[in-house]
Amino acid sequence: MLYRLHLDLLDSQPPIWRRLWIPGILPLTDCHRVFALTMGWEVTADYWFKPALSSSVNPPHQPSLPAGSTLADWLLQPGDSLIYLYQPSQGWLHKVTLEAIASPMEALTPHPLPEGWLAHCLEGEGACPPAFCHGVWDYLELLDRLDGADDPDYDGLWQRVGYDFDPDRLDLVAINQRLHTLRMDSDGVSHNQ
C-alpha cells in the first residue's frame, strides 16, 4: 500500500512542507533518503525518527525508533505521525503525518507513476533552507538579514545563498527528478543516476 504523507519542517516561517506518496513498507532508513531528497537535504546526513504524541502506536520512553522499522509499523491510520530529525546537531525537526493509505491504482489515478518509481511529491511550499544554516532559527535570522539592505553583510549573504534564492519558491519538477532516481531492490533503496 502507498502512504500519502505530509512532511512539515517545524517552526519555519514561511512554511516549508511537502506532500508525497511513498510505500508503507519502506524501512525508516530508506525513508530518510526519500525525505532528504524531497526536502532538498543531503542523504548522507545524520538523522533519527521517534514517535509523535499523536501516534496511535507510542511506546513509552523510546528516544528513537529502530532502524529496521517501516512506516507501516508506526503509522497505522490517517492522523498518526512521526518526528523526523535531520542533522540532530542542528535540530531540523519535521513532523511526518499519515494523511491517507491507498493502493497504487487508487493513489495515482489519473496520473500513474512509471514502473519502478519509489516516491512522488504531489505538492509543497517553500524552498529548502541553505545547507550552511544551523537550524530553523538560524534560517529565520538569515531571511530577516536578506530582507534588510542596511545589513552590513547584505551583499555577502546574497552571494552565499545565490542571487536566485527565493524562500517561497518550490521546484516540484526538480524534487521529482531526484525522487525518480530511487529504486527499491532486495537491499533496500538504491540511487540510480
Task: List PLM regions with ranges.
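Short linear regulatory motifs enriched in tryptophan with gly/pro/ser
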Residues: 1-193
